[in-house]
Amino acid sequence: MAATSQVSSLLDLIMSLLDTATTYQHQESVKNEVAESLKTIGSHQPNVLLTACHQYLLQNPKLGAFKRAFVLQTISICVDNCEVVSKLDEQIIMLIINLATQEMNMTKDTDVEWAESSMEVLVTLAKNTRFVSHVIDAILQKFPPGQTTSPHRYIVLTMATIAVHNPFGLVPFLTDILSRTVPLLQHVKTDPLRCAWARAICSFCEAVRECETERPKEASEEYIGDHSRPNSASGHCQEVSNRATYSDQTEAVYDVIFSWIYSKDPKTRGEAAECVGELCLMIKQTRLVEDVKKIVTNMIPLYRKSYNESHMITQGICRFLEAACVDETCPLEPYLEDILNALFPNACLDPDDTTVTLSTQAIKNHSEAFRCFDVAATRFADRIVYYLLHKMQNVADSQKLGAINVLRHLLNATGQHMEDKRSLLTMGLKKLLAAENTTSIRVKRAIVQLCVALADHSYVDAEGGDYVIAFLVRNLVGPTEQESAAKKVEVDVAGLNQLRTQCAQALYTIANTCVCATKLLWPYLLEFICCERYTPVVGDLCKCLRTLVSREVEAGRKMDYVTGFDNPKVAGRHAVFARLFTSFCNAPLNGLLTRRAREAGGLIQAVAPWFHPSMEGPAARWSEKLEPLLDELSTTVSSGDSAPAELRGRKIARWHEACLDWLSACVAVVPEGDWRQDLAAAMGKQLDMYKELSDEKSFLLRCLGVTLARITAKQFVIDHMMLMFKSASHSVLTERQGCARGVGSIATSHMDLILIELENVSKWEHARKSSGIFGFIKDTMPIRQYPDIEMIHLRATLMLCYGHVVMACSLDTITQRLQNTIIVFLRNYFANSKQETVVREAMLETMRLIATAVHPSRIGGEWKFEARNELLAYAKDYLNGETPEWLTSSLRLLACKTTAALVQLEPPLSPADIEDIGTVLTRQILPMQREKSGLKTLAFDIFDYASSSVFSTFSGSSSSHTNIYMTPPLTANSVAEGPNGTPIHQRHRGIGGKMEDDESATIMDATMHQYGLALEQIVRMAPTTQTIMILLKILLPYYGKQADHERIRAVDMTVLVLRVYYECAEDISLGHASDFEPLSSLLGRLAPRLIDLLAHVRLQALSAIHWTLRLAYMHKGHGRDADQSLFSYSGFVEKYLTSGDVKLEGQKEKLAIEAIAQIIEYRLPQSQMQIYLSAIFEMLTDRQSHVSSAAAQLLTYAVMARGATLNAEAEILVTKMVEKLADIHHCVQTNTDVLAALVAFAVHQQQAVCDVLFKQPLPYSINITDAWECLSRDKLLFAVILDHLTELLGASLDQPFELMDSGGGVSAKVVNVEPCTYVAVLAEVVKNGEPESALMERLPLILTLLIHFICSVSDTQFPVMQKEGSKNPLIITPDLRRAAEKPAGMAVAAIKNLLNRTRSNMVIEDMNQARAWTDCLDKDSFIQAITVFIRSLVEQRPAWVSPLAKTMEEYANSESEPRRLAAVIIAASLIRRSTSENGEFNEQLLVKCIRRLEDSLTDPSLRIRKLCVKGLGELSECSSTDVISRFVHMAVEAAMSGLDDHGDRKDTVAIESIMALNKLVQLTNNDQLKSILPLVLLKIRPCFEKDSHTLRAASFSLFGELGSRVGENSEEFRGHLHTNIVSLLLHLNDDFEEVRQNCANSIYRLHGLLTSPNASICIERELKDGKQPASYNLFIKDFASILANSFPDRINQYALATSNYFKSSSARIRCNAAHLTGCLLDGLTAPLRATISRELVFTGLVALLKDSEDVNVRISATRAIANLHDFH
């Protein structure tokens, strides 16, 4: 439609909407809105809409396919509405039906959407019984009888779809349809048409069957002369016969459709196959019998040619099977094999296979194939079972899986048909379950599932159940690596685990429930229990065996240990016993091992008589002691009140010791030596079974050692000891430990024999191997000179063996054997520090075991171990070879444990030795920060808690002694106090804590713990001050390390050393006073650490200080008596240091430092003061700013307290403090604290300090800022500095800037340096100046100068470079230009500081809310910002106002424009409210301000004139009516004159005039308002549409004000209100918030003038108190309806006025106009609709539909047209 054509009806509007949708078809939002609008119109005027759509399609024959589809979809949506069906005109519907059929016939094969839209129209109408006959008639018109050419494909599909949605509507026409179809089908040649006809015939058949179901009475007729037809495969439904009505026609159709199976198109073949299947349920039974061969032989081959049509073919076959299997009449047997072969591949798909993505059709086809087998099984179950068993023998996994799954499905789904096939199934599955049948894991898992199904149906009890058992047992374990490599297949670990779990569960189920379980499983399972491959499933086998024995015992039968045990494959009793004991290894470690041990222990107890008749008693200990112990150790969580959770490593050690004790008891009760040797031999043979299981092998070696200790045959012992060495993999740590502990166990009974054999083993290193790793030859060979890795690990095992042999040595011979034999032998190895790490670790462990063995508490007496220092030297040599930061082994941990054990031996270490060993340990351990991965998991293997701890060995000592030894260093924040107030720290155990060498800790944590124990033992052996100073000297350098872990470790060790010294000090005499030398150094370095970032360091530092002061008190001769004057540790922590793991708050830091400074001042001797200060100065540069600040505070307290004694050092002290300022500038608090000490000195040189600071560059550095702050806080300096500054600043403002030539005739104002400097200083000194009274006296002058500064420099800039030749230092730096942006920003900063100083927070808040601080920097907005500031002072600080105004009086007549401007700003700001000092009204001040503004109305400056008009407008808010009455006329005249200001080119004065008038009209009497009203209304009307949103907002506001004053009695204003109401409503949703708000206010204030109650109610509800509506669209909808109903004579005026805005430049206004138009014209009565100028309005809306700028405009126009549905 052309843009210039006139639109006058709804029909034209609908046509325009359709044109819009087709024009903007790619804009989904527009298209969707048009569709929604058409839907709305269609729900009210469906006939008009349908007529419009009909005409549109007819008038636009060349419209594109997608566009025509949209129109048809619109029709479909309209007629699909149930509410409008009754309104539809039948003639129009007939036209639409004909249109749809014509459109359908016009489509091509590619026009899918167009054709489907046409079909949707017809189907939608056909769903209704009113129109279904018309639709089918219309369709049949396109399908005349006798036609040899098929109708359009979508005509056929439409009939099919109608049959699906309304079968009862179509079936009455079916005879006619089929009569036309039958002669036509043979002429259908194209594949798409054949597909359509096949689909339609399927739908026809389904419709007939559905009608039979819904109307069974109509289906009571029987077939005449033929068998009845079933409707299901089960044959249980009643026979129905109304299909007979169509039997002849369907047979004719069947003949034609069947020929389509031979089509070349795969989809046609699939559709034809499904259709043939459906027709099989419709044709006569005799015909089906005749065509069985034809159907089978033609449908089966279709699978080979199908692509995606398999599902349709399978459905067709399924329907055929339903018809053929209902009884025995159909001769299907000859073809069953072919049918199954065709269906079976479809059943072989695995929907659970995640490696293959199956389509939805494939999954449906799979289910349909299963259904086919299910249907066929109702008649041919035995044939199907044979078939499936045969398929299971196929080599392809998919074939096997398919057969297994189908068989399982039949067992579960068609059980009644499979009952008599039990023996057939059992025998048929033997080959599948046989061992030689190697299949994949997926197939095996499917077989297991089939076995479960067989067990559920009691098939396993029958003959052949042993094959099932063998299969399950065989698949308990996966293939070996060799087998997998031979098959060249990737091992599916997850699949193997699932298979094992399924097999184990199936075996247990059989053992627990099967009647013949004992016959099947006993002793068959014993063949596998000792097989290496079955090691992972020993627990499952034991469970089954134990269950069998329990069932036999419960049944009162004895186990048969004879029958079947002659089988060589069945394991013997010794082998089983050894195997079961090895299963106890690491039982508490996890649930799997616990379950294995529990089952093995239960089996040992159950079959104990089989092992030996005398073992039944000891075997009972399993349930009495060991099983409860296992339950206890398996518990991982302890309750809150219970003992701490035991370490996992200690649990395993306890468990192993208990098991070995049980083994020893079991062996001891057997008197026969041969039985013991047989058991040991069986253990030796099983060592090779655990090549890959080091933990089990290590435990078996220990078991073998315990067993050999009970054997007296020496040669047997020697042979098996050698076997232990040869079988152990010495490169594995756990096996080394197991071998060494096993040898130690043997040594308890054969000490001499073991020592001799160990020497023989040591000679292996010097012999050439002839075979294997440790083979050796008899002939003489030279000694090897090159290292061998196997020999290295053997050497490590040998060293460990000697350690455990020493521990096993009897106490009466240990010293002699050690000195004469063992040490002499080991010294050759110990002396070589260059050996490999593994050997050094073993030697350190051996040293520790030796020291433990000869500890005085163990052997008694005062025997001295002379080789102690020698061994310590070896340990130091080993440590020195390590890298401090990198932890790669357990060598350091073992060295600490060795040191802790050796230092306990007599005699005590010398000071030199202490320093030497302490330095080496500390240097190698404290810096550790990285460790090699994997060390953590070896922790409990390396350290066997049962015997490796020095302290656990001496458990017989006193409890107090044990507690002292076991107290670890502090690692958590738990705090308590002892009897003397001494801090005692304990580690949180169990929950979140890491104890000792637990495997939950890292090796690094365990190493630190052992390091602490080593230092503790050093102090305990030599508890003197000298020892403490040596150790502290080593630790002090680590207090200030940057690395957290080094500080933590250093203070931890310090606390540990001081605590242990306090407990054991021997150089303290009661009554003898002496200095505690480490006191000053510790206090100087640890006191600042009280506010370390780490809470742990803080608490430990305080603990160290407490211990230090306690020790100093002891050294005064008081002994260990309580020092009543010493601070309470817990009280100090609670008061100052309680902050959790985060850093302390600033106030708490100061309080803590002040408190500790007072303590130090009281307790530090003057003789140690110099050392203390030196330490403090070192701490000033600590890496942590909080710590350096604390040091500075301590320095301040020290200077203040003892300054009189430091006169000679005062100058040096101050100099150092000033020098430190640059070094500590990063720490503000440190600067502050250092400057605090500087203030006392600065008082005497105040003038010099000021002069120097004036010359510092701007912006001031942190140091200079802090200096000014310190100076201003001094009460003597503050007032003098202020007076000096104000004088200098006032003089500098006479010439605040210079004009600089920028080139090209352009100059720029550049601010001078002096005013900036003085303002910057002023900003600093007013921050914290004292006293405040001095500041308040000078406050008016300061504010005046700052406001003057802003006015003077508002349009200036900073100098970019310094003047040439200037010798003054550079003050205005680039940093200042970046920080302050503009010079006025410096005054803003000063004002902020001043307000903060005077606690005028509300003034700051007022400025923040108005964003006035930012406006101060803008040359156009600074006046408003100052106004906000002055008015805030009036409200918050009235006492400042009068002095400020008085100070400004001298500026009023100044020649300087900035001074006059400042005076006018103050005067204008005080018009609204002028107050005296007490906050009351000050009329005198107000009059002065008004006069000042009146006098300035003629000022040459435009901004001053503008400000005067604005200020006089504020007179409306004045509280004095007298003053208002005196000056309001003058103010109004001034505002009116401002409307015509000739210099006002940008309407700035005009805007202020309108705003002033807006305020003043409230104060003007009616006569005066009436006199100016015509002029104001004339002036204001154009302002509504000005581009300036500020002017629009002011105009709307003034209009509202005028109306509220004179509108009630002025008909003239009422007329203007109706004229302007449209503008108010449209701009209520203006682009700018200010305009929207003013419109809302005006509408709210003027609603009474409309004299419409409904309008008033609506406005008061939606625009309450002048607020904007919550939803503009909803408000316009309601209000427009009210306007139309209230003022029907003006509705056309409103509509035309609104249409004028259709061409507005604002897209939002155009949207609003469209919306308002739609709402105004919605729901009008017929007479009112007749008054509307339709052509203008409708044409404008249509133009908006084509808006090219904004899509929202088109959407709004579309929505508006939807509301015009009544304009038809």
Swiss-Prot record:
This is Maestro heat-like repeat-containing protein family member 1 homolog. One of its GO terms (cellular component) is cytoplasm. GO terms for biological process: lysosome fission. One of its GO terms (molecular function) is membrane destabilizing activity. The lineage of its organism: Eukaryota, Metazoa, Ecdysozoa, Nematoda, Chromadorea. The gene is hpo-27. It comes from Caenorhabditis elegans. The keyword Repeat applies. The keyword Membrane applies. HEAT repeats lie at residues 4-47, 164-203, 816-856, 1166-1204, 1483-1521, 1731-1768.
